[in-house]
From Swiss-Prot:
This is Photosystem I reaction center subunit XII. One of its GO terms (biological process) is photosynthesis. It holds the Pfam family PsaM. Keywords: Membrane, Photosynthesis, Photosystem I, Thylakoid, Transmembrane, Transmembrane helix. The chain crosses the membrane at residues 7-26. The gene is psaM. It comes from Thermosynechococcus vestitus (strain NIES-2133 / IAM M-273 / BP-1). SUPFAM superfamilies: Subunit XII of photosystem I reaction centre, PsaM.
Amino acid sequence: MALTDTQVYVALVIALLPAVLAFRLSTELYK
């Protein structure tokens, strides 16, 4: 099962979104 470029990018976005949100939340809390 080969991944297409689109599937790879979608998976990256899905993985990165929670990480970015958590990072922004932590920076807000620890200001």
